[in-house]
Amino acid sequence: MITKRIIPCLDVDMGRVVKGVNFVNLKDVGDPVEIAEFYNKEGADEIVFLDISATHEGRATMIDVVRKTAEKLFIPLTVGGGIKNINDFRDILRAGADKISVNSSAIRNPKLIKKAAECFGSQCVVVAIDGKKRKDKDGWNVFINGGRIDTGLDAIEWARKVEKLGAGEILLTSMDADGTKEGYDLEFTNEVSKTVNIPVIASGGCGKLKHFGEILKKSSADAALAASLFHFKELSIEEVKNYLKKEGFSVRL
């Protein structure tokens, strides 16, 4: 049985961890280094660190914060935000990240995925896909720049393409579900995870314990990501893992 992963996400804006609803109305949650260290001790399987303002503002990712965060961790760290080229990949990996997540830059330059996979290995390359259901309800479009720009690309087709280009994992966020706490987007996650043969991390919408069980049971997602639930101490990672174990899932305790 494949061990399912529970992953807290640190959305970082101007050096602080923030959380919003549907990608807006951001609240300050705290210091990224302290929060990452806390989750590491709590039993998180990995941590995702996203500098959500980096791409939009055209800034390089805050390498010093990444380095300080990585120094405190004994679990894999995925870093994204403002990664535009192979040099950015190299700099962030040298700062201590285990994997790099690309989103907007991969859309603008799909060859970046292929080149990064060739240079550093597919296991280092995560493609983040932010998807939103089309107005006609027939499928999902990919959004970039922190959910500000609709690319018009079909999310399922894009997932298929990034796998072919060499991505080792997909971080899939439902913009419709994000921040609502009404549960992960089962339909969207299922459609993507059954289309590709690489791991898919489900993101967006988790609000209670049962939502973790639902997404891991009713889709082929390999991991569940959450932010506000953990940041605001509504649930602990230990509670989630104990619940999943009771539900029959293989988890690392």
UniProtKB/Swiss-Prot annotation:
Top-rank EC class of the record's enzyme: lyase
Pfam families given in the database record: His_biosynth (PF00977)
Annotated Gene Ontology cellular component terms: cytoplasm
Quaternary structure and partners: Heterodimer of HisH and HisF.
Presence of the UniProt keyword Amino-acid biosynthesis in the record: yes
GO molecular function: imidazoleglycerol-phosphate synthase activity; lyase activity
Matches recorded under PANTHER family: IMIDAZOLE GLYCEROL PHOSPHATE SYNTHASE HISHF, IMIDAZOLE GLYCEROL PHOSPHATE SYNTHASE SUBUNIT HISF/H IGP SYNTHASE SUBUNIT HISF/H
Catalytic activity: 5-[(5-phospho-1-deoxy-D-ribulos-1-ylimino)methylamino]-1-(5-phospho-beta-D-ribosyl)imidazole-4-carboxamide + L-glutamine = D-erythro-1-(imidazol-4-yl)glycerol 3-phosphate + 5-amino-1-(5-phospho-beta-D-ribosyl)imidazole-4-carboxamide + L-glutamate + H(+)
Keyword Lyase belongs to the record: yes
Active site: 11, 130
Keywords: Amino-acid biosynthesis, Cytoplasm, Histidine biosynthesis, Lyase
Native source organism of the sequence: Clostridium botulinum (strain 657 / Type Ba4)
Family membership: Belongs to the HisA/HisF family.
Broad class of where this protein is predominantly found: cytoplasm
Pathway: Amino-acid biosynthesis; L-histidine biosynthesis; L-histidine from 5-phospho-alpha-D-ribose 1-diphosphate: step 5/9
E.C. designation(s): 4.3.2.10
Record localization: Cytoplasm
Stated name of the protein: Imidazole glycerol phosphate synthase subunit HisF
Gene Ontology annotations of biological process type: L-histidine biosynthetic process
Function per UniProt: IGPS catalyzes the conversion of PRFAR and glutamine to IGP, AICAR and glutamate. The HisF subunit catalyzes the cyclization activity that produces IGP and AICAR from PRFAR using the ammonia provided by the HisH subunit.
